[in-house]
């Protein structure tokens, strides 16, 4: 089949070249127009349900809202995890779906089930779907600053809410623009309880009057002078004077009682659950641009910047927009870095080809397969919808060296055959027809084996395709692009390369012996191979012993899920204890931001505590997320690295009650979306009794702090909230004609504040809040004395119908699949994650006694690593079986297929030792490198075995037991190995040359790519030894055994 394709391609070379030209043009177009991003979209398919229940405590929110929602969502088809968050006034439910679920199908199914449960929610409470986005979509953040002092926080927040937000939402693929920080303006109706009692007016009557006085109505239309006039009756509250003139009732003598008679109306701040701060200089308002899932971040950010630049002239005097996070900077750095590495690889590979072949046009034949293979890969990427990012470009980068292997072997074989023809016909001139025949025969001779070897490299990545979840989405693009590049190279090797050789390998072909590099290789390899053939069993014994040496470095390298990617920015997310007030949170935020700004490498600090106004942010008030923008690396102090900056930041920011955590922004949001855990290692304690869960979590926290490598450990306190319980006495309430609902309504309105509508001021809307004065509700004793007007117009106090007690309770409730859960956040430093987790598991098993009904599970990145390892342990053996079948089909001998498969472990030895030497940990990235190495090692074995078989087949006497001799066998093996050392050395050299820029490179994405490249480069030391020495020795023993059997 392969032979037929080669011959037909050469026969129709004009059409093939036209096809290659078309591919190059099409590929160039796709390269220019392929969307770019820093990382693949790693988000799980997620639907968020947000429900506001203002003023309600977390336990009430959990019982009345979150629990009905989570238990219902467990039945949604395709849902794998349902997480619930109940906090003060808000419920968040995150429904995580199985991989491959269409996000809009998921939203429709959640909406369907939401309709079923809506009737079980409290009156007036409505659950809403969040945007079709996730926390990973936070691509651009900005702050509004007024350095002139003309505008306060309320003005800045109004500018954000009613101007900037709507302008930015018009940009395509912006799912949401979330406001954060500042102060929301609120009209506050502060009731005087004594005056209210004096006039005999209840709180409910005031609420009703406010609602009735803030409306507009239409009166249809009338016709005047042949024109139509529409009638409207204005009634919106727009000024404080409008509020003061609201009539509550009329006295017996007809004198009206106005709102101003019983209340003070003022403009003040709405209760805050989110605070923003800039550079330690004070509070600001800001916004977060959230990208719609699966869309092009770079294009959207560019559009956002253009829009903000346009809007600058419309801003009030003194107000400026300060960019506090811009993901496009990371995208540009990552793409520029990988594109530069690809160019470096192309140049180095070209130089290596020219040095070995000693013939410029022959080198060009090999080099041209690189851009053509790149075009093929990008064309398939375009149809699949893959964007260009660190991982997809990285797949092409690690394939570059192997892509030219087939071309190199074909060119070298063509050189050999042309040289032999000249030797056989010293007086003849090679005509065009004969040249094409020689080159076609040379291609056919090695083409099938080369195609199989490239197919093996392609199939070696099957285990990566089977990875699930976040790890599958991360490494899938790399596996796809490497596969496309290698498949393209395999196709080019049998279709285009033979034609290019026919056109370009012309003129005088320098003999191999004329190249000093080739002479040096033969001079070194010749005596060594003779010794190997003389002692083949000893050679195999040494190889087996060398494989055993990897046991020592394997015990030292440790393990992790992924190395931390340097995104150029940092996220400071300290864990704090619950129950902090808004004022204390703002003070703490400013202190930490000021300390962070003191580090010279920091350019800007945008601190946030609490949540932004979006369903994608469920942060409680005590949760800090500070975005740190670093200066360009060339402006750092000499010798500073990201690790050293983090260490200095950690030593600088030391405040009581804070457990520091420094993480990359994108990586952290991905982890929180996938597992819910913001730290690299997390432990989830689940159960039914909150006190038992809390006690166990605190025990685990104490145990974790004793484990080597644990930098910080903090357990969430479920019972850390402070409560004032109003325990209604039903019997006493009944004596005054009041029901439990009446008392609860009074507490909700007088203490919590009742929202009684909003003002309409152009496009702006501001809330109206009704409540008692602060002095009447600032202590338990004050609450007891709150006056109540009963339905029977009796004056009583709250203490007459309820007991007021101070207690503790949950500040926030988390559930996973409807089970209450407490999370312990653990940050590990100076030690690999796997070793830390193993010691943690051992320590918890020995020192923590599980309570009945509780369970402990490790989460975070460790959970992802365990899942990836489980999948790879299953799929790697299956892939080896597939490769074995291909080898059998190529050689038609079980022994030869087994020889190549069994020798692959020897090739991995160098990779493991290089990992240890460079201080890298085993991870999914290094595992990917080892899988790629195994494919290349199998290719080396196939090529060597092909040459050895050709050499032996050229000596017919070796197949005859009567004429067989070990000396003749050694001579044949010598010809197959030593005289073909050039192509084997070239394949090794181009792969190493292609990978070195990746290994030693810096910049965005280099952390992952260097760990993929390291095993491959280390393996390129032992894999050639496998090909050059072990396979000839083993093949000799196989032939000797075959000869004995024949005799």
UniProtKB/Swiss-Prot annotation:
Transmembrane segments: 14-34, 338-358, 363-383, 391-411, 446-466, 485-505, 532-552, 871-891, 898-918, 928-948, 985-1005, 1012-1032
Effect of residue 623 to I: Loss of copper resistance
Effect of residue 755 to I: Slight decrease in copper resistance
An MF annotation (GO) of this entry: silver ion transmembrane transporter activity
Keyword Protease: no
The keyword Nucleotide-binding appears for this protein: no
Family note: Belongs to the resistance-nodulation-cell division (RND) (TC 2.A.6) family.
Function as written in the Swiss-Prot or TrEMBL entry: Part of a cation efflux system that mediates resistance to copper and silver.
Quaternary state and interactors: The cus efflux system is composed of CusA, CusB, CusC and CusF.
UniProt miscellaneous comment: The cus system plays an important role in copper tolerance under anaerobic growth and, under extreme copper stress, in aerobic growth.
Name used for this protein in its record: Cation efflux system protein CusA
Organism: Escherichia coli (strain K12)
Gene: cusA
